[in-house]
Regions:
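Long, highly charged low-complexity segments
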Residues: 1-80, 94-114
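Active-site-proximal helix-loop-helix substrate-binding element of RNase H-like nuclease domains
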Residues: 37, 71, 75-171
Length: 171
């Protein structure tokens, strides 16, 4: 009955056009070629050492936190992502309900030296959020670069500076 009422008001539903613009087609082709073998779920504390060593060797690491809230002051830490080389990254679950989650305090203790090391650049999107989340856990991030702020400084009024927009523009 609800469907017939909707049809009487709005008419028969029409399928979207199958025409795909070039930008969407190129993007989907690029996605289909992504090799996921170098994206790792960290399942034990010892695996983190390899990622710390790599970040120290390279001198920079992209870092991102996953949390339970968009408010960093109220957010609980759920996971941490690290990436020092293109096409290679890891995710460390610390607040998941599954058995794959690693003890948060032990992970924080292990990552503290790296994240506070001023000789290793930490790169993030809206990294001030991550700064607050880590600070709540006793880590003071140092030597940070924020892609959101970089975008704003370079093109303040040109675009939005969120990750989706920046990905569309630069990737």
């Amino acid at each position: 009955r609800l469907l017939s009422s909707a049809i009487s008001v709005y008419g028969e539903p029409k399928l979207a056009s199958a025409n795909i613009d070039d930008k969407t087609l190129k993007y989907s082709e690029k996605l289909s070629t992504i090799d996921n073998k170098n994206y790792h779920l960290i399942t034990n504390l010892d695996q983190i050492d390899k990622w710390i060593n790599e970040a120290e060797e390279v001198g920079e690491v992209a870092v991102d936190t996953e949390t339970t809230s968009l408010d960093p002051h109220q957010a609980d830490l759920v996971g941490i992502s690290l990436c020092s080389k293109i096409g290679k990254a890891c995710y460390i679950p610390v607040g998941h309900r599954s058995s794959k989650s690693i003890d948060k305090d032990k992970v924080i203790k292990k990552l503290k030296k790296l994240l506070e090391d001023s000789s290793v650049k930490k790169i993030g999107q809206n990294i001030k959020f991550d700064f607050i989340v880590f600070f709540k856990h006793g880590i003071t991030l140092s030597s940070m670069e924020d892609t959101m702020l970089m975008s704003y400084v370079l093109d303040a009024g040109k675009n939005r500076h969120n990750m989706d927009t920046l990905s569309d523009i630069h990737l």
